[in-house]
């Protein structure tokens, strides 16, 4: 399981608890910058501050198979990502970073694995949607746009 752009880890915690990830033997890899330049759209998010990384890590302290990694995707993925992925959630709101994550991780997604693209259908992220749609089309995949504005791909 992988999430790129985990922010505070809320959705990852819900998935981890629902699946009882500790009992499955699976790992969960969470990535985020955890800090953003002043004036950007992300600086308006609640709880964004200098302790976000440590707070997010603490949220998963009881789950040793969950790794919270700080850095820029896709660079942080090198040597710090799983070989096989059953579930990939991408939520970085940045087209180049999301395409970089797909380039680095898509081949590791198992057949039948799920890829969720957050904000795929949200009108504020058309550049992201267009880039992802073209990327998947070039590989023979269609993105299903869900009513929640997420995109779903089953490999």
Tell me the role of every PLM-derived stretch.
Residues 1-155:
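S-adenosylmethionine/decaboxylated-SAM
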């Amino acid at each position: 399981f992988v999430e790129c752009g985990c922010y505070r880890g809320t959705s990852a915690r819900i998935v981890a608890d629902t699946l009882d990830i500790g009992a499955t033997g699976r790992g969960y890899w969470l990535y985020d910058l955890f800090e953003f330049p002043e004036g950007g759209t992300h600086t308006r998010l609640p709880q964004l501050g200098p302790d976000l990384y440590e707070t997010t890590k603490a949220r998963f302290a009881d789950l040793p198979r969950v790794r919270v990694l700080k850095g820029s995707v896709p660079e942080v993925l090198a040597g710090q990502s799983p070989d096989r992925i059953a579930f990939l959630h991408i939520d970085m709101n940045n087209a180049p970073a999301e395409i970089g994550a797909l380039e680095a991780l898509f081949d590791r997604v198992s057949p039948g694995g799920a890829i969720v693209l957050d904000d795929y259908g949200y009108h504020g992220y058309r550049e992201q949607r267009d880039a992802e749609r073209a990327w998947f089309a070039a590989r023979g995949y269609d993105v299903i746009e869900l009513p929640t504005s997420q995109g779903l791909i089953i490999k």
